[in-house]
UniProtKB/Swiss-Prot annotation:
Disulfide bonds: none annotated. One of its GO terms (cellular component) is cytoplasm. It catalyses: tRNA(His) + L-histidine + ATP = L-histidyl-tRNA(His) + AMP + diphosphate + H(+). Signal peptide: none annotated. It is an enzyme of class 6 (ligase). Its EC number is 6.1.1.21. This is Histidine--tRNA ligase. It is found in: Cytoplasm. Keywords: Aminoacyl-tRNA synthetase, ATP-binding, Cytoplasm, Ligase, Nucleotide-binding, Protein biosynthesis. One of its GO terms (molecular function) is ATP binding. InterPro entries: aa-tRNA-synth_II, aa-tRNA-synth_II/BPL/LPL, Anticodon-bd, Anticodon-bd_dom_sf, His-tRNA-ligase, HisRS-like_core, HisRS/HisZ, HisRS_anticodon. The keyword Protein biosynthesis applies.
């Protein structure tokens, strides 16, 4: 019988892969804290309606890519394909629509039934940020600046470009929608089957189509800029001015669009050329209508999400694994003292390990194999004198220290 393998489109996070993954999450978490964001953790699966409302019944994600199932109680549940919907649902469920703004950071796995390829998995991981309850363009600029600061902290900001667009306000989009219907109706026969169906229900969804024949038509479709109201222009100007003031470079790209009605004003993507077709590493926009879709009041919001796998691939080097200290008892008579020292080191914040078997030589070999910085050797003679031998494994230097001085000494080196 062949050994079991990970399900297609999934992967194990082990060794260097996990080190890179953890570094992205920890870096983003630190930057989020500097911006005053609190971390939330929402369920990995939700009522299917949560995502049908957030993504739209006609979207590819809902119609083709969601992992949905009926539980034993007959409820339709879905593994989350993205993080924003769950955050907005949690905001309403927990009665936080009266305590705004809320700044939310999250990280975790998402699930979509897509064709696996480089940088794209069926179980993938995201970091994300949602700033809920602020309608001003400065909020959008702050969210974007935070995303760029995450990329800077990861050392990859210079390899990405911020593409920025406006989707206007409700009045702007209504006029734009009418123009799009007229345009796509004239070339209806050239549209894909999916887009012909969307033309009847939500023509903005055609703008998100990945079908080659649709992409060619979308390229020549009317653009929102011709339909912006004075209020939408003012918001757009305010956002660009704030980004300039914050020192966040961007390029205007009218091709950055969102197909759902509750999206408006800001849409953006940080893209790179290093990952080929999967070049978007962090993207977001303003979604003032989504909280209302979850049963709450109409609430302004701006957010983004970044793919951890893609961000990990851009890191120049794998972060160094933490190195432990190895406690090495020299003889069974010293084992009790070695265990006490082991626990004292851990209590003092020092990563420490002990080999469960073997003579002194074997234990030292294992200490080198696990990359220990120091070996703390303690035998019956050391126990009797209340000392230990602390050996630096990188250069072989050795010092004798009192037992109660070992932990402060090694903690100081680690700090």
């Amino acid at each position: 019988m062949s050994s079991l393998q990970p399900v297609r489109g999934t992967h194990d996070l082990i060794g260097e892969t996990q080190l890179r993954h953890a570094h992205v999450v920890e870096t983003a978490r630190r930057i989020a804290g500097l911006y005053g964001f609190d971390e939330w953790a929402t369920p990995i699966f939700e009522d299917t309606r949560v995502f049908a409302r957030s993504l739209g019944d006609t979207s590819d994600v809902v119609s083709k890519e969601m992992y949905s199932f009926e539980d034993r109680g007959g409820e339709s549940l879905t593994l989350r394909p993205e993080g924003t919907a769950g955050v907005c649902r949690a905001l309403v469920t927990n009665g936080l629509t009266q305590s705004l703004p809320q700044k939310v950071f999250y990280a975790g796995p998402m699930f979509r039934y897509e064709r696996p390829q480089k940088g794209r998995y069926r179980q993938f991981h995201q970091i994300g940020a949602e700033l809920i309850g602020a309608a001003e363009p400065l909020a959008d600029a702050e969210a974007i600046a935070m995303g760029r600061d995450v990329l800077k902290a990861l050392g990859i900001a210079d390899e990405t470009i911020l593409d920025l667009n406006t989707l206007g306000d409700t009045e702007s989009r209504a006029a734009w929608r009418t123009a799009l219907i007229g345009y796509f109706t004239e070339c209806r026969d050239q549209l894909s089957d999916d887009s012909r169906a969307r033309l009847e229900r939500n023509p903005l969804r055609i703008l998100d189509s990945k079908a080659p024949q649709d992409r060619a038509l979308v390229a020549d479709a009317p653009r929102i800029g011709a339909f912006l109201t004075p209020e939408a222009v003012a918001f757009w100007d305010g956002l660009r001015s704030a980004l300039d003031l914050m020192g966040v470079p961007f390029r205007e790209n009218p091709g950055i669009v969102r197909g759902l009605d509750y999206y408006g004003h800001t849409a953006f993507e940080f893209v790179t050329e290093r990952l080929g077709a999967q070049g978007t590493v962090l993207a977001g926009g303003r979604y003032d209508g989504l909280v209302a879709e979850m049963g709450g009041p109409r609430t302004p919001a701006i957010g983004w999400a970044g793919g951890i796998e893609r961000l990990s691939m851009l890191l120049d080097a794998t972060p160094a694994a933490p190195r432990p200290v190895a406690v090495v008892p020299m003889g069974e008579g010293a084992m009790g003292a070695a265990i006490l020292l082991l626990q004292a080191l851990r209590a003092g914040g020092v990563r420490a390990e002990i080999a469960y078997r073997g003579n002194t030589k074997k234990r030292l070999e294992r200490a080198n194999r696990i990359g220990a910085t120091h070996a703390v050797l303690i035998g019956e003679d050391e126990v009797a004198r209340g000392v230990a031998q602390v050996k630096a494994l990188d250069d072989g230097s050795q010092a004798e220290l009192a037992l109660d001085a070992v932990t402060p000494y090694l903690a100081g080196l680690a700090g």
